[in-house]
């Protein structure tokens, strides 16, 4: 898609350059091209709800567009929600939306045009270009919390931790507690700091965010990551001790926090509790959501590697994954679809998925295609080898790439599953020297980790 050109200058709150009677502002003061004050208010509330992971943003945007059908940024935001479904079937619809919005270019601000350009790149599966566009937008409108959150979300799926951090730091000069939404910025910054290894700073920013807004699931999540990386399992389980009723009005992301809580119980040596959480809080959410597939698949595999029998729980995940083998929207998602299929013994379907990945990487450009070729396909080859019991092949594939998995996306904690698979393969395949090296690396990174200390000692027994 061709980026927008022309249009009016200005259009951001930080350096306002003009005023117009057909404009209103969002909660942070960013100019909105709409004649409807009601539509502007609904748009602002949709952003707030989006930050809090509530189920209501789409409905608010629909209502805003009913108030003003020409409200370009509301339509763009709605397109972003469609993209977050991560379903290839919606791509033509989103691209049509982008084409329609570009016809309004001359009446929109530069900030709004950049939002549309970012959505266009995203719909073309060039996540990196979408992120670069949001980064440009934030240089002219650092108060644009929507752009910041969208960038944060998608940069997360490129595995570029330092980018998460630097982009927020570049906008921090415009933020303090007097600006609505500041706690959400604190929460995003906390997560970025954690992914960059600045755990003490991350915990402070995250706890400050939660103190200001106890509804901020991302800030709660950021602190949970710190507790996980520092092996503070009991604190983590207490921190994430929320019931289904507590989060009844939240979207499926809530299950990811329960996934973290289950990992804390697993770390505390209570796999039975972790499996119960899977059955009661994860499996019951929505298996059609790729987030829930990744949560469940990664937890089930961790449980299996600790000797738990998860019985037929793979089957539902494999059934869903089998319907999505040609999507290739996110490498992170495809990796977990592959895991679910391979763990359930769907050999032919996995072969079809891998062939589809190869064709996609060959026939397409952009970040997703490049990451599929460089990282996803060999990772999935390693997963398939592991599930087929060929542990030597698993080690041969995963050992050289163990420190280069970031392009798959996700967090350090999420990608750690693939290292655990390598470690388990090294033990089961009697690759003793390799296993000893892997466990030594673990203990150097987290001294005193009792589980890995026991594994290390067992190799010499």
Feature annotation, model-predicted:
Residues 49, 82, 121, 155, ...:
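Residue at a conserved register position within TPR or TPR-like alpha-solenoid repeats
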């Amino acid at each position: 898609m061709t980026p927008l050109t022309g249009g009016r200058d200005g259009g951001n709150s930080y350096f306002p350059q003009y005023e117009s009677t057909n404009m209103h502002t969002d909660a942070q003061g960013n100019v909105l091209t709409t004649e409807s004050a009601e539509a502007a208010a609904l748009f602002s509330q949709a952003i707030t709800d989006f930050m809090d992971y509530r189920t209501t943003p789409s409905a608010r945007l629909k209502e805003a567009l009913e108030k003003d059908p020409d409200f370009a940024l509301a339509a763009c935001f709605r397109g972003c929600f469609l993209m977050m479904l991560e379903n290839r079937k919606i791509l033509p619809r989103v691209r049509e939306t982008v084409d329609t919005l570009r016809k309004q270019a001359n009446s929109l601000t530069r900030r709004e045009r950049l939002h549309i350009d970012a959505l266009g790149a995203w719909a073309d599966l060039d996540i990196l270009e979408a992120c670069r566009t949001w980064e440009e937008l934030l240089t002219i409108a650092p108060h644009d919390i929507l752009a910041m959150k969208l960038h944060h979300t998608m940069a997360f799926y490129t595995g570029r931790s330092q980018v998460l951090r630097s982009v927020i730091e570049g906008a921090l000069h415009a933020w303090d507690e007097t600006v609505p939404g500041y706690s959400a910025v604190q929460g995003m910054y906390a997560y970025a700091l954690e992914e960059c290894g600045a755990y003490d700073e991350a915990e402070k920013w995250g706890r400050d965010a939660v103190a200001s807004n106890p509804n901020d699931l991302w800030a709660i999540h950021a602190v949970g990551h710190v507790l996980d990386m520092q092996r503070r399992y009991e604190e983590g389980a207490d921190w994430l001790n929320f019931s289904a009723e507590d989060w009844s009005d939240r979207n499926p992301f809530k299950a990811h926090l329960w996934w973290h809580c289950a990992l804390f119980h697993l770390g505390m040596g209570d796999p039975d509790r972790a499996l119960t959480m899977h059955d009661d809080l994860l499996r019951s959410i929505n298996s059609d959501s790729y987030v829930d597939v990744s949560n469940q698949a990664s937890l089930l595999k961790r449980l299996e590697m600790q000797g738990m029998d998860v019985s037929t729980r793979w089957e539902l995940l494999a059934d869903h994954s089998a319907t999505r083998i040609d999507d290739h929207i996110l490498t992170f998602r495809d990796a977990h679809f592959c895991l679910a299929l391979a763990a359930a013994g769907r050999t032919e379907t996995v072969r079809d998925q891998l062939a589809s990945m190869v064709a996609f990487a060959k026939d397409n450009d952009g970040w997703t295609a490049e990451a599929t070729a460089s990282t996803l396909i060999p990772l999935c080859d390693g997963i398939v080898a592991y599930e087929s019991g060929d542990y030597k092949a698993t080690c041969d594939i995963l050992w050289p790439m163990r420190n280069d998995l970031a392009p798959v996306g996700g967090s350090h904690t999420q990608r750690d599953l693939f290292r655990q698979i390598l470690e388990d393969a090294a033990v089961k395949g009697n690759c003793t020297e390799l296993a000893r090296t892997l466990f030594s690396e673990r203990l150097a990174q987290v001294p005193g980790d009792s589980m890995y200390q026991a594994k290390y000692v067992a190799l010499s027994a």
